[in-house]
Amino acid sequence: MINASLVAMEINNCLPAMEIPRETENYEGFYHLISMSGDVAEAHLNYIIRDHDASLFEAKKATLCHIEKIMNEKWGAGTVQLTITDQYRNMAEIIKKCMFLIENAVKACKNTNIPPLILPIRGGTDGCMLSYMGLPCPNLGTGGHAYHGPYEHITIE
């Protein structure tokens, strides 16, 4: 008998333990287990993958494909079924062509005596998708905290 919940745990344990949001920062990529469900017969793991570097992002997807292959060799063909859906790509390659947007924002901050603070955004945003649709939308002034968790919020002072 194959216990699907135990196979799911094994899959998660195959991922690099230090490449999770809690253990990474700034431009470091990660695997983020956002939901899981299961029992003896069937289990589901749902991850998001983030990386600012396109080649490292692709490598993370390849790692998941490799884990699927290993698990199916161990437990039998079709035991593990991986679906990868691209939902987010780093918008830097689009924004680099439109740096005047960032320059204008920095200038506006300086004109109002607000020191500009430029930090990486570590999650997917609507602006990313809009940027790839032809409307460059850099992330400006998110003000957010505790992303991807139950206490994610933005202060509206």
Specify the residue positions occupied by each region the protein language model found.
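Metal-dependent amide/peptide-bond hydrolase catalytic core
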Residues: 2-157
